[in-house]
């Protein structure tokens, strides 16, 4: 008996000694739950998420339109002559809407047809990987990005409990990217287990909306020649849309050339005129039967557009009644989360939660709205993803008058290139800006900043101004980030005009030479 007691005592002592060791391990182990933006695969049958049943991603909506281009041209001419654009609108709608027939939700904004992301985050296995180093683990939260973000936030709450239990940790970090930031915001507003959250990262979060989505959903589309020029030059040349270099150079320089001689503006005036004639017919119903059926996309309509968007898409009392369930979900996010998000984050910050905000800049905005010249990451406005930064327009700097009015303390948050004033951000001390890093680009160097934030108590933009100052510049060539340097040498209007003319004629001559020699490749890859 004594021997048995002695063995039991030894076991108990070993267990007692092991408990503190387990606590230390759990404390050192950083687990991050990563909520991506839209884009997870959607399947027609969630019980059989196979390639044959995948309904998202779908083909580009431009592809059906290209097949009816000739007929569209005839319908447009007929509309211009008669003033009746019905056939033109019907042809566009009938080309686009069928592509989303399987993907769209019902009139309550719900998936009642058995479609979904094909993953139950409360029971199925989840994807996890080391995050920068072996002390950090990143776990992916997969969800049906079409649904209400509040619905997905409820699932996230339960998933966090599951992760803590299975990973043997008491807390996790949250990382919300783009639409994932909306889900995080909904969770922070309504979650019952916020004691399980350590740090929160809002990575180019669309919590407060995306400008071009607001313009499309509200019908308040405004075309501007300078914005089209900026957008075409960046996206055609930098994103490799046109694969033949000579063709690409010619097209981009042609856009700039016709803008400089004021012809582009006249052309856009015509497009704007047609758009104003047809938008209530074709745009409203096309949006309603595609992305407008997703409560999640309504969560990305900025507050300034929201009321107009509801009235534009559901433009009769009958439609409002018919889509009452969807509108209720949209209203709930707008009224209870979007317009209170900053106050809620500030409240949680005061309670001890740490927030890291990462925004990006130096890209043209989509040329569709009154803010087409605003600073952006190519998708979302920098002022929105930073929760309040004051930004110079694209390819411009803040005025000397504005800078002179800043206090000495506020000037600490001024970007070296004079494009961003971060002093007006919700969290100016923990908001970083990455220059020249496109919205959909998430380099390893950025991940290292995030992990450094997790590991450093009370880290701010002033903690390490050599490696991680508030404003960093991303290099496509090296994949690294370095401190942003002084003001860019931006050309004057006279210099820009001269450069545009020289560039156009040089590329035009090169284009003609290659055309005559049969050296041009295909237009698109």
Task: Enumerate the language-model features and the residues they cover.
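Positively charged n-region of N-terminal signal peptides that target proteins for export
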Residues: 1-4
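Alpha/beta-hydrolase fold catalytic core
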Residues: 139, 143, 147, 277-372
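Alpha/beta-hydrolase-fold enzymes
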Residues: 225-317, 321
């Amino acid at each position: 008996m004594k021997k048995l007691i002695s063995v039991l005592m030894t076991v108990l002592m070993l267990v007692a000694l092991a408990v503190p060791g387990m606590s230390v391990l759990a404390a050192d182990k950083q687990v991050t739950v990563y909520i991506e933006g839209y884009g997870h695969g959607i399947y027609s049958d969630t019980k059989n998420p196979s390639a044959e049943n995948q309904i998202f991603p779908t083909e580009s909506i431009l592809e059906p339109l290209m097949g009816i281009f000739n007929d569209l041209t005839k319908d447009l001419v007929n509309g211009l002559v008669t003033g009746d654009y019905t056939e033109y609108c019907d042809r566009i709608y009938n080309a686009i809407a069928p592509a989303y027939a399987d993907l769209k939700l019902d009139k309550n904004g719900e998936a009642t047809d058995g479609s979904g992301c094909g993953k139950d985050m409360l029971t199925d296995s989840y994807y996890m990987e080391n995050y920068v180093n072996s002390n950090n683990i990143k776990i992916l939260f997969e969800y049906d990005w079409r649904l209400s973000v509040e619905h997905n936030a409820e699932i996230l709450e339960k998933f966090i409990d599951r992760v803590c239990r299975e990973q043997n940790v008491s807390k996790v970090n949250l990382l919300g990217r783009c639409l994932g930031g909306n889900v995080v915001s909904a969770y922070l507003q309504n979650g019952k287990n916020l004691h399980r959250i350590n740090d929160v990262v809002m990575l180019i979060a669309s919590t407060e909306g995306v400008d071009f989505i607001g313009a499309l959903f509200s019908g308040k589309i405004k075309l501007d020649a300078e914005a089209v020029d900026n957008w075409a030059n960046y996206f055609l040349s930098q994103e490799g849309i046109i694969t033949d270099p000579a063709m690409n150079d010619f097209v981009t320089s042609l856009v700039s050339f016709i803008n400089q001689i004021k012809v582009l503006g006249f052309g856009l005036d015509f497009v704007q005129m047609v758009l104003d004639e047809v938008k209530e017919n074709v745009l409203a119903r096309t949006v309603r039967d595609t992305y407008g059926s997703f409560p999640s996309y309504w969560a990305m309509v900025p507050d300034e557009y929201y009321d107009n968007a509801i009235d534009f898409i559901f433009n009769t009392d009958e439609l409002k009644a018919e889509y009452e369930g969807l509108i209720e979900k949209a209203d709930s996010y707008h009224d209870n989360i979007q317009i209170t998000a900053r106050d809620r984050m500030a409240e949680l910050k005061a309670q001890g939660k740490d927030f890291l905000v990462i925004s990006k800049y130096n890209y043209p905005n989509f040329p569709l709205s009154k803010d087409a010249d605003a600073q952006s990451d190519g998708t979302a406005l920098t002022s929105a993803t930073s929760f309040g930064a004051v930004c110079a327009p694209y390819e411009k700097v803040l005025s000397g008058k504005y800078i002179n009015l800043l206090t000495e303390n506020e000037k600490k948050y001024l970007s070296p290139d004079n494009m961003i004033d971060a002093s007006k951000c919700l969290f100016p001390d923990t908001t970083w800006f990455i220059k020249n890093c496109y919205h959909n680009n998430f380099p390893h160097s950025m991940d290292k900043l995030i992990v450094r934030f997790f590991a450093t108590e009370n880290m701010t933009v002033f903690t390490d101004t050599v490696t991680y100052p508030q404003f960093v510049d991303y290099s496509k060539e090296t994949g690294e980030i370095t401190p942003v340097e002084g003001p860019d040498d931006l050309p004057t209007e006279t210099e820009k005009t001269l450069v545009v003319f020289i560039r156009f004629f040089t590329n035009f001559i090169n284009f003609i030479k290659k055309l005559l020699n049969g050296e041009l490749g295909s237009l698109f890859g």
